[in-house]
Amino acid sequence: MGFSFDWDDIFQYSTVKIVRIRDRRLGILHLSFLVGIVAYIVVYSAIIKKGYLFTEVPIGSVRTSLKGPNTFASNLTYCSNQQHNGSTYPFTPLECNYWDEQLALFPVGQDSTFTCTTRVRLSKQEANCNFTDPTCKFVDEPGSAKNIYIADIESFTILIDHTMYASSSGSQFNAVDLHGYILNQDGDEVQIDANGTSIGVSGKPDIMTIGQLLSFGGVSLDQASPVDSNVSIRYDGVVLFVFITYSNTYTYSTSDFKYVYSVQQIANTIYDVPETIILESIHSRLLYKRHGIRVIFIQTGTIGSFHFQTLLLTLVSGLGLLAVATTVVDQLAIRLLPQRKSYSSLKFQVTESMSNPMKKRITTDEGEDVLYTRIEGL
């Protein structure tokens, strides 16, 4: 039994064919798809979403400094050594000491972080043994340990000096050169410029009180600690994230830069750090176990610059929708409409072998096949 091959079938070539179907239903549907897709690509992707911008996250540095108030508050309810004018404190009050910024700030010299003390456990410790002995340990001198609060820490002011840099666009600014905002508890962007404090005012450094910083994060030092409801945050300490978000994409002018502070308390976290002061010998020391407000600055944001390749990619990625629209209309024409048989036979054509006269078979809507010969002249 022999096998015969038709080389024209084996090496057949499929090509694109354009058929103009005079059907208003298909035409209006396809035109609607095209208008919607062009509007999506040009208006939404390219213009509204700024698909012509190459964006990057800036880097930067943050420097902070602390300053005590000119006049301290008194009669504080959390101070056991002060008059309270009949007010009560919901937690156990402690003795209060008035410290300046040099004492209240610890640790010092850290990048992108800031810490100020709210409570200290002070103790004098002695090691009446030789450190060659593995059991040698420091112990508190009897009666030397005491807890104190740092009075009126909320009135201290913090200066925040930050700089941002975006490598691709070459943008570099200091906070003094920009206008900025801080988010309040309602999520609104606000500026501050009163009573010696300022936030986001171009030409002025950012200065706010510790109390303002806490309030923007929804934190009070006299609310319950997140890990022990029997003591306050003033007693245990707190850790805050301060996000500095830079942007030049909030308008259609990439020369307009701004930054926004947002303060977020880290849940279920307190802060303490030990400070050791050696006295007359290494066997004698003062131990300050500090609890306080730990602020961690995180610089982020979106800096954009015009980039032709990014615009081209935005346009090309949307053009794929045009092929989808054409496919949907084609399938509607050849599978769903009453004229689907005629439309299908017009869309798909299989020629006779090149060795035979060219013919074309078309199916009518009634299902009848009509054979055309010499189709080169059709």
Curated annotation (Swiss-Prot):
Lineage: Eukaryota, Amoebozoa, Evosea, Eumycetozoa, Dictyostelia
Organism whose genome encodes this protein: Dictyostelium discoideum (Social amoeba)
GO biological process: calcium ion transmembrane transport; cellular hypotonic response; contractile vacuole discharge; contractile vacuole tethering involved in discharge; hypotonic response; intracellular water homeostasis; monoatomic ion transport; positive regulation of vesicle fusion
Topological domain ranges for the Cytoplasmic compartment: 1-27, 329-378
Chain ranges on the Lumenal side, renumbered to this chain: 49-307
Region (Pore-forming motif) residue spans: 290-303
Any one GO molecular-function label of the UniProt entry: GTPase inhibitor activity
UniProt gene name: p2xA
Transmembrane segments: 28-48, 308-328
Alphabetical keyword list: Ion channel, Ion transport, Ligand-gated ion channel, Membrane, Receptor, Transmembrane, Transmembrane helix, Transport, Vacuole
Effect of D330A: Loss of function
Pfam families according to UniProt: P2X_receptor
Any one GO cellular component localisation term in the record: contractile vacuolar membrane
UniProt entry tagged with the keyword Chloroplast: no
Protein name per Swiss-Prot or TrEMBL: P2X receptor A
Phenotype upon loss of function: Response to extracellular ATP remains the same in p2xA null strains. p2xA null cells have been reported to have compromised contractile vacuoles and defective osmoregulation, and exhibit cell swelling. This is contradictory to other reports. Quintuple p2xA/p2xB/p2XC/p2xd/p2xE null cells exhibit a slight delay in their osmoregulatory response, but are ultimately still capable of regulating their cell volume in water. Extracellular purinergic response to ATP persists in the quintuple null cells with no alteration in the kinetics of the response, but the magnitude of the response is lower.
Function as written in the Swiss-Prot or TrEMBL entry: P2X receptors are ATP-gated ion channels that play a role in intracellular calcium signaling. Not required for the purinergic response to extracellular nucleotides. Inward currents evoked by intracellular ATP and ATP analogs. Exclusively selective for ATP over other nucleotides. Insensitive to P2 receptor antagonists PPADS, suramin and 2',3'-O-(2,4,6-trinitrophenyl)-ATP but inhibited by nanomolar concentrations of copper and sodium ion. More permeable to ammonium than either sodium or potassium ions and less permeable to choline.
